């Protein structure tokens, strides 16, 4: 497939570009800044510029079979709040609607479990129930989570209007190597550090594999899919964590051992995807 990857210079974007090239796809990479030279070997073409520019967005999607939209500020602290929201939402709107108009058949919208509204909330909300499913209501108050929630609405709208298959992948904390080790060390020192993220995680390389799988699976319409590792970041059992940090949350299904409190069935069934990287049995590298 001919695939546009937006935000190609980001932490996930770089992994996605390399993964797609390894899987035989032809990659056009976009970012608002110059990309590292190390990405050149994986790309057929590079587009540099701001996706909020409608003409640039139209140019970026032209001739593509699929779009992977990973461009976004990655947290509410990455810029001023107004800039985080307007950049993330407008860039999603520009590139996804341009893809729809251009007849692009497959859209992978890189979303986040922040679209639930838990991860960055200052009021420390708890999920209504676990395992948290994709239809859990939005409970957020931060601009980043709101921007990802709205981005999923944009993807669904584009799918309905132009008939494209659009998949919003909800990722948790992503990391590998030193980034993952640092995150784990903070959680192990104090499990409350990851309370808002419900101790979910995924190796960045597995996230890229999930994106690649999404491009070729037989899907239709728009669907949001949670993609996480099967276990948590914590050393304490999941039920103990929930009782300590989310005592009002209803536990609707068994969560033995360190099982992640997110429903992952949709990802396994629709994407035929299972993470291969783990931190409990191997060194986090």
Model-derived features with residue positions:
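N-terminal Rossmann NAD(P)H-binding glycine-rich loop of SDR-like oxidoreductase domains
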Residues: 3-23
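Conserved Rossmann-fold NAD(P)-dependent oxidoreductase catalytic core, especially the SDR/UDP-sugar
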Residues: 94-141
């Amino acid at each position: 497939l001919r695939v546009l990857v937006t935000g190609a210079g980001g932490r996930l974007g770089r992994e996605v570009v390399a993964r797609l090239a390894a899987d035989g796809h032809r990659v056009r990479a976009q970012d608002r800044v110059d990309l590292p030279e190390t990405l050149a070997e994986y790309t057929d073409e590079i587009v540099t510029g701001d996706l909020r520019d409608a003409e640039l967005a139209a140019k970026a999607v032209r001739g593509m079979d699929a779009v992977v939209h990973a461009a976004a500020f990655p947290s509410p602290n990455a810029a001023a709040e107004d800039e985080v929201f307007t950049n993330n939402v407008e860039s999603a709107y520009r590139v996804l609607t341009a893809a729809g108009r251009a007849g692009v058949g497959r859209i992978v919208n890189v979303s986040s479990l922040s679209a639930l509204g838990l991860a960055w909330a200052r009021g420390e909300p708890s999920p209504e129930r676990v395992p948290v499913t994709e239809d859990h209501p939005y409970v957020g108050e931060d601009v980043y989570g709101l921007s990802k929630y709205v981005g999923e609405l944009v993807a669904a709208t584009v799918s309905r209007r132009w008939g494209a298959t659009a998949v919003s992948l909800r990722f948790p904390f992503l990391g590998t190597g030193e980034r993952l080790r640092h995150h784990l060390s903070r959680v192990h020192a104090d499990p409350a550090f990851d309370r808002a993220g419900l101790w979910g995680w995924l190796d960045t390389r597995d996230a890229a594999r999930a994106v690649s799988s999404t491009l070729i699976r037989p899907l239709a319409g728009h669907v949001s899919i949670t993609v996480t590792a099967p276990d948590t970041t914590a050393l304490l059992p999941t039920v103990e964590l929930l009782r300590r940090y989310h005592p009002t949350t209803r536990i609707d299904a068994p969560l033995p051992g360190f099982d992640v409190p997110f429903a992952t069935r949709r990802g396994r069934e629709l994407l035929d995807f299972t993470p291969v990287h783990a931190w409990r049995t191997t060194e986090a590298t």
